[in-house]
Amino acid sequence: MDLRLYTIFVGFFSVVYAQRTPTISYISQEQIKDIGGTVELECSVQYAQDYPVLWMKVDRNRQVDPLPISTGSSLIIRDSRFALRYDTASSTYTLQIKDIQETDAGFYQCQVIIGLNNKITAEVDLQVRRPPVISDNSTRSLVVSEGQAVRLECYAGGYPAPRVSWRRENNAILPTGGSIYRGNVLKISRIGKEDRGTYYCVAENGVGKGARRNIAVEVEFPPVITVPRPRLGQALQYDMDLECHVEAYPPPAITWLKDETVLSNNQHYSISHFATADEFTDTTRVITIEKRQYGKYQCKAANKLGEAREEVELFETIIPVCPPACGQAYGGDAAEISTSMALILISTI
């Protein structure tokens, strides 16, 4: 071969070789690790001897500037958990992270810088298993009117993606049927007072113990009165308790009436109240009954949604009824009614 031609031929291939563009020949696949574990991320390059090779951490949402971790075979980040190895034979840069934390999750980008605005990149996604955390945009509590349509929403972050389920306090039946509902949104097409109470949103993904949010659902409804014993008998000069149970929300005003006159605490009547969240028990004790106190009494309950009334009739008996007359003097003398005495308890008619 002509010497000049050979020189041109060799020179041509030398120039081509010198101008070959660097490439990233290998990048690690997605990594899924536990908190406290260790991960190694590999990036292999070709034709990059004269170009800077960097590891960067890139925000998953691309809203924060990338964080430089290393350049060439040197670490930039000041974190003892990070280490870097460079294998010259394979041109592989291995980034090691020990004692992985939740904040380490994200994209790790291998970069070969060719020019000011020219670079080659490849990314590996590091996922860190983390327990569920219920999001702020989930329902916290609700106050609704009876008959309304209701949506209870529950969302949770974590990795793997959490599964969301719904339960009620004491495993009560859900409005949708059954004791468990799976899904982010629990829909109640027409809520009733029996649907009120605490609902549990439970998020689980197999990491940790899961997360739970208690959601209080208050249902506004007009008073509903139940009288355990509509007819009660008692002898003259003895006490008797008249009782009514009320369900309502908001809490109702409860009054007792006799002959359309509102009763109050005095020497003839003693009125007591016992309340839970939306259940109320009102008891009126008729003290040392006189003839005029026999008859019909009304328990009245009212809130902004409505009013209800129920009657209790008090009638005269010959023999005192225990309770509440246990231990009271009989017929005005000093003898006391013994618990062993044969007493007559007049049942509801």
From Swiss-Prot:
Post-translational modification: The N-terminus is blocked.
Domain Ig-like V-type: 22-127
SMART domains referenced in this protein's UniProt entry, alphabetically: IG, IGc2
Domain Ig-like C2-type intervals: 132-218, 222-315
PROSITE patterns: IG_LIKE (PS50835)
Signal peptide boundaries: 1-18
GO biological process, one term: cell adhesion
UniProt-listed CDD domains: Ig
Propiece residues: 333-349
Cysteines engaged in disulfide bonds, as pairs: 43-110, 154-201, 244-299
Keyword field: Cell adhesion, Cell membrane, Disulfide bond, Glycoprotein, GPI-anchor, Immunoglobulin domain, Lipoprotein, Membrane, Repeat, Signal
Tissue: Expressed by all neurogenic cells early, but only those cells that become neuroblasts continue to express it. Expressed by neuroblasts, ganglion mother cells and neurons early in their lives, but expression becomes restricted to a subset of neurons as development progresses. Expressed by sensory neurons as they delaminate from the body wall ectoderm. It is also present on growing axons of the CNS and PNS and becomes restricted to a subset of axons later in development.
Gene3D superfamilies in the record: Immunoglobulins (2.60.40.10)
Residues with attached carbohydrate: 137
Lipidation (GPI-anchor amidated glycine): 332
Xref: InterPro entries: Ig-like_dom, Ig-like_dom_sf, Ig-like_fold, Ig_I-set, Ig_sub, Ig_sub2, Ig_V-set, Neural/epithelial_adhesion
Annotated localization: Cell membrane
Parts forming coiled coils: none
Cellular component terms (Gene Ontology): neuron projection; plasma membrane; side of membrane
Membrane association type: Lipid-anchor; GPI-anchor
Role, per record: May play a role in early neuronal differentiation and axon outgrowth.
Family annotation (PANTHER family): CTX-RELATED TYPE I TRANSMEMBRANE PROTEIN (PTHR12231), LACHESIN (PTHR12231:SF220)
UniProt protein name: Lachesin
Phylogenetic classification of the source organism: Eukaryota, Metazoa, Ecdysozoa, Arthropoda, Hexapoda
